[in-house]
Amino acid sequence: MSSYLFTSESVSEGHPDKVADQISDAVLDAILVQDPRARVACETMVKTGVAIIAGEITTSAWVDLEALTRKVIVDIGYNSSDVGFDGATCGVLNLIGKQSPDINQGVDRKKAEEQGAGDQGLMFGYATNETDSYMPAAIHISHRLVEQQAKIRKKSNSPLPWLRPDAKAQITLRYEDGVASAIDAVVLSTQHDPGIKQKDLVEAVREEILKPVLPSKWLHKGTKFHINPTGKFVIGGPVGDCGLTGRKIIVDTYGGSARHGGGAFSGKDPSKVDRSASYAVRYVAKNVVAAGLADRCEVQVSYAIGVAEPISISVTTFGTGKISDDKIEKLIRQHFDLRPYGIIKMLDLIHPIYQPSASYGHFGRKPRELAYTNSNGERVVATAFSWEKIDKAEVLRADAKLK
């Protein structure tokens, strides 16, 4: 019997890098409400007392970036100088320029379906049947822990009123013959008010954050718990560390369980294949696994700037496939249009649906409807996390001729 350990981590919405991601995606969403054809590449940096918004944006929309940035920061929980960062009073610096026309001529075409990729690059999508969300268990649990921290922190009459926004979680799982069998270690660090005793903090975090989330079947006498192991975490958020958009790409995806092409997601409109193609191949891999064609599936796709058709599509099922990887690849080419236009249409991506994805992972989330009013005053209902649907599983299984 082979045995090994595997670890993944997540960070809360109050982590400085995630603050930056959420601002970038809030800017993207606000622009898409007014201008669905906008080209957006928005980068954010947050540090003590300031948020800097930069990047390249081409749009007919007008957005009050200062007010929007402040709202995101305050909604996260940085609303007072007492916690070290106050969205109401921090400086907001706008350094946004326009997208290069050299790029634009390769993306926009007379025929929409001929839309070229916004850049060259390679992207990976992954799915596994070890959790109901088709996500690796370590990253799935890590996300739920920091999500629970925020839920308890924001709760009215919170049982943990001393919690602050910044937090991190890490899960180490033991695998036996490739199957997750136990939690070997749990690490959770949460920012807190001064004055809380370490003993009281540890007990409260165990009861209110860990206990509701950790699967009891995987806990055992030897499970190690490290809760605020430094003993103090008062200084956090943008005061403790500079935050940058796109610096948590492994947290955003599969926690290291799958490969990564290197491109970040937040602040990018769906013409950027770094984002849209990564969503598409997650959709593909998840439907392959949901169809029962494999227990694990990783799909790679690559593009050339200005070219519509993918340069390559490859599939790996790590020996878990019920049919050959070659046959799965043929089914993917048959049922999924992985041109940029095809992806945008297939997943209905030109809507303000992105800010929710900027914390707690872009994958493994439940699709949900979001309503908004567009620039014509019309009410529109869009689906966030549309790439998490498994609506192609049945036809894939049928065409694979699996019983």
Curated annotation (Swiss-Prot):
HAMAP family according to UniProt: S_AdoMet_synth1 (MF_00086)
Gene Ontology CC: one annotated term: cytoplasm
This protein's record includes keyword Nucleotidyltransferase: no
Family: Belongs to the AdoMet synthase family.
Protein name: S-adenosylmethionine synthase
This protein's pathway: Amino-acid biosynthesis; S-adenosyl-L-methionine biosynthesis; S-adenosyl-L-methionine from L-methionine: step 1/1
PROSITE patterns (alphabetical): ADOMET_SYNTHASE_1, ADOMET_SYNTHASE_2
Assembly information from the UniProt record: Homotetramer; dimer of dimers.
Residues engaged in binding ATP: H15, D166, A167, K168, K232, F233, D241, R247, K248, A264, K268
